[in-house]
Amino acid sequence: KAAVLPVPHARMGNCGTLVNQLWNHPDFGLDMPTWMVKRGVKDPRRVMIVSQDPLRTNHKAGALALSTPFGFHSADYRSISCQNRTLCRFVERLLEECEVCVYLTDCRKFYTSDNFVNSHKGQFKGLFGNVLNDELKAFAPNLIVTLGNYAADAIAAKRPRAGLAVQSVNNLKVLAAYHTGARPNHFKNVVESGRKSDYFDEVFKVVHKELGKRGKQR
């Protein structure tokens, strides 16, 4: 089953005209949030993962290119790059080993390869914030994992420090993680190997400890 959170016109603020222009943009990326839970799991804890934006790489669609964050809906996308594989393995471990419900979304809802969205970021910021707040209310996460600075900034007025610590932000529990596309030296600040896969293994352990576990941790 799928559910869509409508955005009333009044919530658009001064972005209505800009959004209408996007529909005719030759290269417009939009990712549908993904809500996942392992079949048969009852009353799971909830983890919300907030990433950056619906990036489109070498994909001139000529129109709206609709997908999901990190292409998670597609087995092909889940395996085509180290960045996707790392994030998808992290999510799959949350679903299988922690048996939590995962909601995967972007803080910046639109992407264009030109400067259209960035040049109007001041106007879009309010709209993106409104939608993210609606998602927070609908999903009611026990823990939020942000990926990168944009996502951390969207959750808190004062950016949480990236690393492996769960912090309390506006009555929400937040783990501000590095983005999967971050430079290796960022990961090396936390794990000796500097490998993003090892870093996200550590992130998983923190989430596992914070939320508790029904089975055995590998």
What residue ranges belong to the model's regions?
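A charged, well-structured terminal subsegment
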Residues: 204-218
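Amphipathic, non-transmembrane alpha-helical secondary structure
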Residues: 133, 137, 201-204, 208
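Short, flexible loop segments at boundaries between secondary-structure elements
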Residues: 164-199
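A polyanion-binding, active-site-adjacent surface
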Residues: 1-159, 173-183
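Intrinsic-disorder-associated interaction segments
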Residues: 8-15, 192-196, 200
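Intrinsically disordered, low-complexity N-terminal regions enriched in serine/proline/glycine
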Residues: 102, 198-199, 203
